[in-house]
Amino acid sequence: MLWSDRLAKVKAAKYNAIDVYFPWNYHEPREGCWDFSGEKDVAAFLDLASEAGLRVLARPGPYICSEWDGGALPAWLYPKSGLELRQNNELFLGYVEKWYQKILGILKDYQFSKGGPVIGVQLDNELDFFDCHDRVGYIGALRD
């Protein structure tokens, strides 16, 4: 794994924090098939960040960025009937809740208040509110 080397270089460059995307489609490539092993081991990464003395701003999406395939939304979501991506849509939010249960279940143990490196969590990213029918409801649902 290159993580230790990369984190050491970041620390040597006098940084004290990093922000990290946690792509949903990387950890659930097929519906219900979760993978947090090997290079996808979030807990191991957070342990290394802590050992390097770096704080972490966690960015689990559900959408992380336009540079990542589908913004990290799993491809298996797209054909779901009645599902509206990145909306206050019960079906979409049900899938997001499963993702959040997995990823936030890991991140909560690494909160700064518990001695871990995670100083914050950003929900969603690059949200274009022009396309969001219920902005307040969507962000509120992610938060809750």
Go through each PLM region and give its residues.
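Active-site region of glycoside hydrolase catalytic domains
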Residues: 47, 51-59, 64-144
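Aromatic-lined substrate-binding rim segments of carbohydrate-active enzymes
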Residues: 2-76, 142-144
